[in-house]
Amino acid sequence: MRKNSAKVTAAVLAAAAVLSACGGSGSSTTTAAAGGSDTAAAETTAAAVADENATYKEELHIAVAQQAPSLDLHKNSTLIARQMMDGTVWEKLVTQNANAEAVPELCESYDVSEDAKTITFYLRKGVKFHDGSEMTADDVVASMNRWIEGFSSAKSTVGDARFEKVDDYTVKITADHSILLLPSMIAGAAQPAAITTAAACEKEDSNGFMTDYIGTGPYKFSEWVQDQYVKLERFDDYVPYGTKGEPMDGWAGYKAAPTKVLEFDIVPEETTRVAGLETEQYDIIYSVQNDDVPRVEGMDNVTVHSLQAGTIALVFNHKKGIAANQYFRTAVNTGLDMDEILTACYGEGGYELGSCYMDAAQAFWNTDAGSENYNQKDPEKAKEILAENGYNGETFKILCANLNNMDYIAVAMEQELEAIGIPTEITTVDWATLTDYRKDPDKFDLYITSFAQVPVPSLKLYFGPNYPGWSDDATLAEKFEAMNTATTMDEAKTAWEDLQAYSWEYLPLINAGHYIANYAWNSDIEGLNTFSGLYFWNAGIKE
């Protein structure tokens, strides 16, 4: 048996703190403005430790750029929902450490069989839900199986296998093939494997979304006023894990919740977010545009943190319309200049070019397979492809959101595509509407989105045939399955390289490059966790 215990040594945690302070793989930087120093800022973000002897300001106000369509993480892949709820309201069987490895959270330990077909999780005892009930195997089985049904990547990984109860504090899943990568999927999925009560799994609205947000995390759901804010309140009966006073290892470890209330204020306009930070209306703001970073860095007592946060994706509609044709996707990919379209959105320095579908922090999975088809910026060749295949000038429909300047990408694409003879039609909506529109194949030929970092390629949602874009290709599915069913990590890496090389031919999407996310906060805040995002489990301002 392959044993994965819950034990985390102080030496490992200390190493993780150093790694976090240095920016991990080199894709993260923190700058303190006039009120602090670079060293102090790095130490603050690395430690993520609350002072139990201090008194903290009662509320933190966090200004975010958009509203989530739902807070049901089982069926919602939007980043903002995860940033609000994952690890805060809901926790998982396992989570990620600083090396992007799956380590216990709601389980004491887990075993992977030698053939990697069976995984057994041994649950922590005495963990309380926000409704006061104790977490048992019945809740975990209901939650995990609901997650599998709602998450195409998990479903394709496990096939017909589902979680089952062994006893009140043990669950397992057994497949007819290797599910080696499943723990990593649980730890870092874009649709988190949140554990809730069995009863909550049964209560859904007319859209199939959960209506009761009951978790085990250090904060409980309080209120959601549409288009205004989401409020979370500290759960005083939270049962922590890890060692009090020691820094977190990635997302794993002790959560003290020193702040009573976390309020996520929905503020679409960046200028309003920045102004609110300056006047201290907001303590933390998301989505600082790259061009505005120098100005925000110049504010008194403000810290700016930047990191490579994910990929910019141009997702084709494979089900219907002109982009369902392979030749057309190839022509579009051949003609586009990624520097031009990314500069339009992020400005210089706000992105990094790169053909790898994975991000810099996932060093094990980095590959240049298929890179010869990336950023060709060859409009003449694109014209030839269109002419050879009888393209007759059908309009190309681009769907985008007026979020973080993503609509600027659409305008830059329009100019480049029309130069090679492709007339375009741009539909610009808010983010919540885009997530609804992209479910309708009649509304777009391509939509523009971004994908946050994930620990394994299995979590790239667009490889699933049910994800909007509908890449229902037999060869793609075969190569994806080969990776997911590998019995060793080396086999999985080889299969991934083969999958990425084919993807740059088939084009489930165009990976335009990697975006840099900028956050800013009041430098008086202590205990922020900046591993692969921004998290508030130990964050607060001392009074």
Where are these regions (language model features)?
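N-terminal lobe/hinge region of extracytoplasmic solute-binding protein
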Residues: 63-114, 145, 214, 511, ...
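A structural "hinge/loop" feature
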Residues: 64-84, 106-108, 133, 181-192, ...
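Detector for C-terminal structural segments
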Residues: 84-85, 225, 229-230, 308, ...
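Aromatic- and charge-enriched surface segment that lines or borders ligand/interaction sites
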Residues: 108-153, 166, 172, 322-324
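Surface-exposed binding/hinge segments that line
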Residues: 111, 115, 156-202, 207-225
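Alpha-helical secondary-structure segments
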Residues: 136-143, 170-172, 217-218, 256-261, ...
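Structural transition elements
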Residues: 219, 351-388, 405-406
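Ligand-site clamp/hinge motif
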Residues: 240-294, 423
